[in-house]
Amino acid sequence: MELTHPMKIYKICDARLWKDAKKAGTFHGAGIDIEDGYIHFSTAAQLPDTARLHYHNREGQLLITVDATPLDITWEPSRGGDMFPHLYSALDLKHCMHVEALFLGENKVPTPINGWPK
């Protein structure tokens, strides 16, 4: 049975980094991405835990929706063996479908105003 992966993947990103990426037309990732050699993304189902574990109490975050279809995404195990999307190159911003500001919601976790994507 062939595994199917979602067409949309997501990145939580500091607004200042995103501003720089918009000027350049490409996103190379945050510090952890550059350190690891790939851009960390999440699926819609993984987003709430990603926000809670890695972005707790961090204001000024954005949720970037990315069309994964044309990208060379590598799916690799991470938290609990769950498969996460990774991009081993810079992200051309033409693949970004939507950018949304997050607010510090319940328990100081950055959250979209209308809830997480399904």
Q: Which residues does each PLM region occupy?
A:
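Conserved, structured core segments of small domains
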Residues: 2-118
